[in-house]
Amino acid sequence: MIPEKVRKVLEANGLEALEFEPGSTPTAQLAAARIGVETSRIAKSLLFKAKDGSYFMVVCPGDKRLSSAALKRAAGSKLSMTDADETERVTGYRPGGVCPFAVEGVAILLDEALGDYATVYPAAGTDATGVATSLGELARITGGRIVNFSEADRS
């Protein structure tokens, strides 16, 4: 079930969430397979913490890994990824369902590579949801800043 705070944001912006079986989309790869799109069209959301205690949510294509140097430039300081418990405490979402909607006190950084596609799919608050949107809509809805900080996954 989609969290009420996310549902309100989506409805206010004319977006509709996709809902699947519980636990069916916990990774970008599984979400892509379930939705029927390339992994690069899944907008994964990762939470980071700066030394000063501020938080940054990075939203990037599901097939990308982050360039730490570019991330540091975008955030203005070195960041450390938060663990599952801290992520849930700060965002209200568990890993697999983390999304940039209805998150307070967190700077949102959106990878410009998401703009390679007309439609991308971030989670909608649980690991069984997604929402079809665009980079432009994500920036408008979340107030996020568009930056370039990812690189192709070489694994």
How should these model regions be labeled?
Residues 1-155:
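Extended, low-hydrophobicity, polar/charged segments
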